[in-house]
From Swiss-Prot:
TM ranges: 74-94, 95-115, 123-143, 145-165
Listed Pfam families: PRA1 (PF03208)
One annotated GO biological process: vesicle-mediated transport
Entry keywords, A to Z: Cytoplasm, Endoplasmic reticulum, Membrane, Transmembrane, Transmembrane helix, Transport
Disruption phenotype: No visible phenotype.
Location (main, coarse): endoplasmic reticulum
Record flagged with keyword Transmembrane: yes
Family in the record: Belongs to the PRA1 family.
Record-given protein name: PRA1 family protein F3
Organism annotation: Arabidopsis thaliana
Membrane topology term: Multi-pass membrane protein
Self-association and partners: Interacts with PRA1F2 and PRA1D. Interacts with ACD11 and BPA1.
Length: 188
């Protein structure tokens, strides 16, 4: 007798991945990356120019930091990543720490519970920050990390001062209406 065309069944249950938690994680990653602005908007050369004064520079810094914060974070992380290429141990530690941050801080739906005690976000943030600094400093790449952070901060500061803010949509509703072409006009 053959079982041609029959679907074999297993007597033991295979471990199933929690599809719901993966879906939530995917949604949170997309929501986090949704705050990233288009790179062509960030580097639009027609929107570059020197500020008229110190107050204009501070206004641009404040506006651009708020508007391009995810892009700036990506730039700083890329600078840190490239600075650690010659330190493979530090690069591995950095990569592991990024994954830990993603799962313990950014993708978490529910508060962390440890021995029936609930740990708040501020504590998680402080512990992860201290752990990140200590582990990266223990990898003997302190000079590279500090240099990369300073380089990233200088790049962000230069861009935020030079990038004009007049064409930025600070109101999300206006931005989505403008990009979707659903502009309404008052009827006469």
């Amino acid at each position: 007798m053959t079982n041609y065309g029959a679907i074999p069944t297993s007597s033991h249950a295979s471990p199933l991945v929690d599809v719901e938690s993966l879906s939530r994680a995917k949604h949170r990653i997309k929501a986090g990356l949704a705050t990233r602005r288009a790179w062509r908007v960030m580097f639009d050369f027609h929107s570059m120019g020197l500020p008229h004064g110190v107050s204009d520079a501070f206004t641009r810094i404040k506006t651009n930091l708020a508007y391009f914060r995810m892009n700036y974070a990506i730039v700083v992380l890329i600078v840190i990543f490239f600075s650690l290429i010659w330190h493979p141990t530090s690069l591995i530690v950095f990569t592991v720490l990024v994954v830990v941050w993603i799962f313990l801080y950014f993708l978490r739906d529910e508060p962390i519970k440890l021995f029936r005690f609930q740990i708040d976000d501020r504590t998680v943030l402080i512990v992860l920050s201290v752990l990140t600094v200590v582990l990266l400093l223990l990898t003997n790449a302190t000079f590279n990390i500090v240099g990369a952070l300073v380089t990233g901060a200088v790049l962000v500061l230069i861009h935020s001062v030079v990038r004009k803010t007049e064409d930025l949509f600070l109101d999300e509703e206006a931005a989505t209406t403008e990009t979707s072409g659903l502009t309404s006009y008052p009827s006469t």
